[in-house]
């Protein structure tokens, strides 16, 4: 199903458990958005095969602009980096997942109560801002890049991993000015959607090749486990199974049925 996560709270996000926030000491370099394998060989004139449609590296965003999507790719990768346990956010298709989520009722805020009055209240009263997920991303990314340009003369995506981490920590600590959007609220939105994309069903654009599930030995949407119910301690030998690719969960008919 598409994301049904609650609006971000005003509390500080809970610490990440397995990897730890900003964890992972293996390869932290960015995964290119475009593959050189897709280029034609100029020497012998051979045309390279077209990239597969499901390759996250060749995805073209639908909701985000190119600059916004580049920020998203790098920010998600710092939150969920590649390490010895498996691929990072970009290889898992997390930015693609978030981009596609923004085109759904969830992204438009249709699943949240979004009517006035909007007042400052205690965290237990829940989300109190007039911004949908679309609004949070659109309203935050440009000020973040502006902040990076002022301090480092480069947008977020062009910063070193160390400085990218500093910016994300500032967001998490509510230390960046994003106009009317509290930076901690945006950070929680980004962090939540990143984790959703890493472990969603692949039908929704994330968890490419079910690598997120494989890291956790999660069996996915397999329908029958009867043969394994009473085998205590036995290792489950079958790989994960995702939802059938049809119907497309982002089709208008599917979205109308969910709504």
Where are these regions (language model features)?
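N-terminal pre-domain segments of enzymes
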Residues: 46-57
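Boundary at the C-terminal end of the N-terminal hydrophobic targeting segment
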Residues: 35-42
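Mature-region segments of soluble proteins
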Residues: 2-9, 13, 56-58, 64-74, ...
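N-terminal secretory signal peptides and thylakoid transit peptides that target proteins
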Residues: 8-29
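Hydrophobic alpha-helical segments, especially transmembrane helices
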Residues: 19-20, 37, 165, 192
């Amino acid at each position: 199903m598409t994301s049904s996560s609650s609006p971000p709270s005003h509390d500080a996000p809970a610490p990440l458990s397995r990897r730890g926030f900003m964890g992972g000491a293996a390869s932290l370099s960015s995964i290119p958005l475009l593959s050189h394998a897709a280029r034609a060989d100029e020497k012998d004139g051979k045309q390279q095969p077209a990239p597969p449609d499901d390759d996250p590296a060749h995805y073209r965003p639908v909701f985000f602009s190119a600059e916004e999507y580049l920020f998203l790719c790098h920010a998600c990768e710092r939150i969920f980096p590649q390490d010895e346990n498996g691929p990072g956010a970009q290889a898992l298709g997390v930015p693609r997942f978030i981009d596609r989520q923004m085109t759904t009722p969830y992204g438009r805020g249709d699943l949240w109560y979004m009517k006035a009055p909007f007042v400052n209240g205690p965290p237990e009263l829940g989300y109190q801002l007039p911004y949908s997920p679309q609004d949070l991303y659109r309203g935050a990314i440009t000020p973040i890049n502006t902040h990076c340009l002022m301090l480092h003369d480069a947008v977020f995506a062009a910063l070193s991993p160390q400085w990218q981490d500093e910016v994300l920590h500032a967001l998490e600590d509510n230390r960046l000015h994003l106009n009317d959007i509290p930076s901690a609220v945006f950070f929680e939105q980004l962090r939540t959607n990143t984790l959703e994309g890493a472990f969603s069903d692949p039908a929704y654009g994330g968890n490419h090749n079910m690598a997120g599930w494989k890291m956790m030995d999660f069996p996915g949407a397999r329908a029958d486990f009867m043969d394994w119910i009473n085998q205590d301690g036995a290792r489950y030998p079958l790989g994960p199974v995702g939802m059938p690719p049809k119907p497309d969960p982002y089709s208008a008919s599917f979205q109308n049925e969910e709504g």
